[in-house]
Amino acid sequence: MSGPLEGADGGGDPRPGESFCPGGVPSPGPPQHRPCPGPSLADDTDANSNGSSGNESNGHESRGASQRSSHSSSSGNGKDSALLETTESSKSTNSQSPSPPSSSIAYSLLSASSEQDNPSTSGCSSEQSARARTQKELMTALRELKLRLPPERRGKGRSGTLATLQYALACVKQVQANQEYYQQWSLEEGEPCSMDMSTYTLEELEHITSEYTLQNQDTFSVAVSFLTGRIVYISEQAAVLLRCKRDVFRGTRFSELLAPQDVGVFYGSTAPSRLPTWGTGASAGSGLRDFTQEKSVFCRIRGGPDRDPGPRYQPFRLTPYVTKIRVSDGAPAQPCCLLIAERIHSGYEAPRIPPDKRIFTTRHTPSCLFQDVDERAAPLLGYLPQDLLGAPVLLFLHPEDRPLMLAIHKKILQLAGQPFDHSPIRFCARNGEYVTMDTSWAGFVHPWSRKVAFVLGRHKVRTAPLNEDVFTPPAPSPAPSLDTDIQELSEQIHRLLLQPVHSPSPTGLCGVGAVTSPGPLHSPGSSSDSNGGDAEGPGPPAPVTFQQICKDVHLVKHQGQQLFIESRARPQSRPRLPATGTFKAKALPCQSPDPELEAGSAPVQAPLALVPEEAERKEASSCSYQQINCLDSILRYLESCNLPSTTKRKCASSSSYTTSSASDDDRQRTGPVSVGTKKDPPSAALSGEGATPRKEPVVGGTLSPLALANKAESVVSVTSQCSFSSTIVHVGDKKPPESDIIMMEDLPGLAPGPAPSPAPSPTVAPDPAPDAYRPVGLTKAVLSLHTQKEEQAFLSRFRDLGRLRGLDSSSTAPSALGERGCHHGPAPPSRRHHCRSKAKRSRHHQNPRAEAPCYVSHPSPVPPSTPWPTPPATTPFPAVVQPYPLPVFSPRGGPQPLPPAPTSVPPAAFPAPLVTPMVALVLPNYLFPTPSSYPYGALQTPAEGPPTPASHSPSPSLPALAPSPPHRPDSPLFNSRCSSPLQLNLLQLEELPRAEGAAVAGGPGSSAGPPPPSAEAAEPEARLAEVTESSNQDALSGSSDLLELLLQEDSRSGTGSAASGSLGSGLGSGSGSGSHEGGSTSASITRSSQSSHTSKYFGSIDSSEAEAGAARGGAEPGDQVIKYVLQDPIWLLMANADQRVMMTYQVPSRDMTSVLKQDRERLRAMQKQQPRFSEDQRRELGAVHSWVRKGQLPRALDVMACVDCGSSTQDPGHPDDPLFSELDGLGLEPMEEGGGEQGSSGGGSGEGEGCEEAQGGAKASSSQDLAMEEEEEGRSSSSPALPTAGNCTS
C-alpha cells in the first residue's frame, strides 16, 4: 500500500505494518469481528468490489506495483483494521496535501464494499459500533473524494459516487504506471553511473543553477534521483512559482507533482542514456548555457496553496540533464536528473510575442490526426504538444470552418502537394475561445505510392482571443466527443487522399510534376511566402488508370534526370564574351560563302557568340537519359586514358545539350580572336532540329589558315535530340585518339573550341526560320531529318577533303596522318607537347612523317595577320555544310615541324568553309597491318598537279612535305562510325528499306563536288566497278561481317570502339564522300553510288577504303617497315596483316592439324551447353526472319567472295563433316555459330582452306569475320566457336 499512500500524501511513506487510528494513535489490539452485513452504503460500492479485494489494503510494498497479500479470508479483522487505517490516514493527510484524490481512499471504499461478503458471528453490540464508525469514516472519505473530483468528470444525470469511484480507480492505475516508470529508471541506473560525470554537492549545485534562475525569474531547477525518483534538490524559486512551501517538495516523488497525463511524457523524455551531461557545458564559471537548444519536454506541474481543494497546474518547459549529486558528505554520489524548468506564459500576455512572430507549424495524417505540433504553438494555443498529438484536427476547428478542410485537402491533391495560402480558419484555444489564423498548406507526396503521406500546415495568428490567458482551464463542460459531422468529414478527406496524385503542375514537395517545367522546390516552412497556385474549387480528381500510374513513375525518374542535368549545367553557364585577339578561325561555310557576309565587321562577334549559350539554356532540359549515359561512358573511357580534364569534358559533352564541358567553350570564347575571324558557334546548329544553319559563314575580314579546334561531329551528335540508336551510332568516337586530336588542336593559351554543329542536308533550306528546328519533342520526322543531315555532312567532308588531297603532288597521304589527321585545325607544336595520352606518345617517333596535305588549313609560320584569301562566291561546292575548322596534325605525335604555306594560294583550291570535322583517331600500341586488295578511293593518290576545273581558281602549290610512308590499306573495320558493331548491325538492317533512295551521288567526279584529277577519279572508279562486278554479292555483306567482328572486339578491347566512328572516316575523306554521298558502300564490297545498300552511317567506310587503295598504288614493299611503327589494335592487325607479319611478328606458328583437333574436342565438349531453339521459338523467329524458316542465311551474311583476289568462289560446304552433324543435333541455327554456314565452316578441310586463304591475304570476308571473332574468343575461352580460331592465329 506504499505506492498509493505515497501518491496520496506526497510526503513520508508509511510502512506496511503500521496502523493508524482516527486520532493518529495506533489502533488497539486485534479488530473485532462483525456479526451482521454491512450498511446500505454497500449498494453504491458493491459494483466495484470485484475490482479489488480488501487484502490489497495491507499488501506488501513493491517497486513495480502494490501486490496482493495472502491473508486468510476466514477472518475479517484484517479488512476492518485496514479500512480504519486507510480512512483515518487519508483524513489526516488530505488536509495537508493538495494532491489528487488518494488511491488509499479508493482502497478503503473497495474494502468497505468487500466487507459485506464476510459476515461475522461475534457479538452484535461491539460489531455494530465498529460498523457505524467505519461507515462514518467512509462517508467522510467519499465527501472529500467528491470535492476533489475534477469538474469535467461531473456529468449531469450520473451518480456522483460512481463517478468519484471511477476517478479514484484511474488514480490507482496512474500510480501503478508511475511505479513502472521508476522501474525503468532503476534498470538503466547503471548506465549513467558509468558515464564520466562530474559530482556536485547540494551547495555547488545551488550555486551553479542560480545563474539560470537569477536571469529568469520564471525558472527554477530541480534534481530528481534516478534511483528513487524523489526530489533531491529544488531551488528556492520553485516555491514562489508553484506558490507553496519549499519543504513540501522534500522527499516527494517528482512525478507526483506532474499532471497525470504528463507523467508518461516526462519519463519517456528523461531516459538517462539519452540525456546530455550537465558537466560538459555548464560549470560555475562557464556562464549561462543556452539550455533551450537541448531536447525539452513540456509538462504541467502542480501548484497553488496547500489548502486549495482544486490543484492548479502550470505549464513548464523542462530541459533535462544527467549528473551526479552527493546529498551529504558521507553519502555516495547518486545519478540524478537535473531539470531546468521554465514557466510558459501566454503569448498574448506580457511579455507578449510580437504579432509577426506568432507562427507555428503542424503536421497531420490523411486521417486528419495531429502527427506533429510545433512547440511554438504552446504559448499561442495553450495546448502542450502532447495534448494535440493523435487528436483529430477537426475537433479543434470552429464548426463553421470544418468544411473548409475538405476544400483545402482537395487543393492539396490538385496541386500535388505544392504550398498554397488559404483563407483564415478559427482554432479553439485551451481556454475555450477561438483564435483566427492565416493558414498555408502543403502536402508531401510519397514518391513511390504517389499518395499524400501527410499534410503540413503553417499558421500565423491573426486575431488573439479575448481572454489572453490561453492556459486558463475552460469552464466545466461535458467531455468533448466526436460529432458525426467530424467523423464524416474525416472519412471524406481520408478517402480523398487515398487517391494517387496526378497533377500537371510544376514540381511539388516530392519533386514530381511536369517534365518541361521543373519549378523550384517550395518549402512548407515558407509556404506563406510563395503561392503554389490559384486553383480554386478543384473538382474531384479523375479516376486513375494503371497506365497513368506507370507514366507518372517515368515522370518522376525523368524529373530527377532533368534536375541532374541542370545541376551539371549550372556552374558552367557563364556568359560568352566577345572574342578578340590573334586567334585565326575558319570560315563558316553554312551557306554559299558570300563575300558581302564575309566582309562584315568584327564587332558583330559578341552577339553571335552569345547565341550558343542561349540555345544551351533553352535546350538544357532536352537531353535524354540515353544521351547522358553515352556521355558518361565517354567520360569514363577518357578518364581511363589519363587525358587532361579539359579534353575529357570536351569529348564528353560537345553540344549545347550537354552540360559537362561548357567551361571549355567558355574559355575559348573568351580567348583571343583576331579581327576578321570568328569561331564556330557550338550549338547554333547543333542538330537538325535544334537550331538553324547559320547563313553568315564569316564575320569579319579574311580568314587565317589556322582553324579553331573543334570536336568531331560524331561526338556532337551524341547530345543531339535523336533516338537512342541514333545517339549511340554517332558515339563512335569515345576513343582516346579523338581526344588527343581535340587536345592537339588547342592553340597556345586557348582551350578547345566549341562543339561544331552537324552540316545540314543539301535538301534543307539554307536559311530556315530561326526557330524552325526548335526541339519540339523526339518525333520520327525530327529524328529522320537530323540523321540525314549528319550523314550528308559526314559524307560531304570526305568529298571536300579529297579534292584538296589531290592538290599535293609531293606526298601520298600518310597512313595515319592524311587519312585521319584532317579533322581539326592545326595545333602549333607549343601546344602538342601538353598531350599526355599514351596513344599519342607512341607516335613521337613519327615526326619525320609528313602531315597530310589536308586542304582544311595548314599550320604555317605565316603571321596570324596574314589569312588565306576568302573563298570566292563562285566556288562550285554546294554551300550546305556547317562550318567546321579542321586542323592538320600528326596523330599521336609530338611537336611537328610545320612547313610554311604560301600566302598567295588562290581561294578556290581551299574550299575550307565546306568541310565538316571528322574524328581522326590513331590507336596506340599496335602495328598497322599490311595492305590488302580492297578497293580504296584515290584520295591519297599523289596527284601530279592540282586540279584545274574551269570553275576553280588555280590551286595553291603546297610546299612538299616530308616523304610519307606508303599508305596502308586501312581495315574496313576501322571505318565504322559506330562505337558498337551491334548498333551498326541494327542500323544497317534499319537502313535497308531506304538504302536504295539514299544513294544519291556518283563517282568522285560527281556533281556534288568539283571533279578531282583524272587519275584520282579513274582509279577508285575502276576499282569500284571491278569489285562490283566480281563480287556479285549484296552490298551489305561486307559490313555485316565487319559488324560481327566489331561486336566481338568492341566488347573486349578498350580501344575497340576506337576503330569505329568517324575515325576511319578521316582516312578516306575525299573521293568517298563525293561518290558515296547518299549511301556509301561498306567494308570490302564497295559498290558504286547507286548500288550501295549500306546504311548512310557507313559513309566513312568505303571512302576511306577507296583512298587507301589508291594510296597503296605507290607504296613500295620496303616502306612497310614504317607503316608498322604506327601500332593498331591486335584485331585490326590480324584482320589486314599479311602472312609475314602474322607468322613472324605476333603469333608463333602452330600446327594446323593439332589446333583443329583441339578445337573440335573443345567444341564437342560444349555441345550439351549449346542453346536450342524450341519449336515455338523457331516459329516466332520464322515469322520475323524468313531465312530462319528456310534454314538459309540472309544475303547480307551469305558472302563467300574473296575481295582481295577478286574471285567469287564459294567456300565448299561440309555436309559430311561429323562436326556439322553434331552441331545440327544441337538445334542451332546458322546465325548462332558466328555468322551462318560460314561460321560453322570450321571443321574438316574447309577449315584449313579458309585459314589458308586468310594467311595468304585472300580469305573471304565472312571467314575474316569469323576468324577475328573466334580468335578473340579463343583467348578468353568464352565462346564455343573454336574450330577456326586456331587456324587464323596460326
UniProtKB/Swiss-Prot annotation:
Coiled coil: none annotated. A motif (LXXLL) lies at residues 1043-1047. Phosphorylated on serine residues by CSNK1D, CSNK1E and probably also by CSNK1G2. Phosphorylation by CSNK1D or CSNK1E promotes nuclear location of PER proteins as well as ubiquitination and subsequent degradation. May be dephosphorylated by PP1. Ubiquitinated; requires phosphorylation by CSNK1E and interaction with BTRC and FBXW11. Deubiquitinated by USP2. Keywords: Biological rhythms, Cytoplasm, Nucleus, Phosphoprotein, Repeat, Transcription, Transcription regulation, Ubl conjugation. It is found in: Nucleus; Cytoplasm. Its main location: nucleus. This is Period circadian protein homolog 1. The lineage of its organism: Eukaryota, Metazoa, Chordata, Craniata, Vertebrata. The gene is PER1.
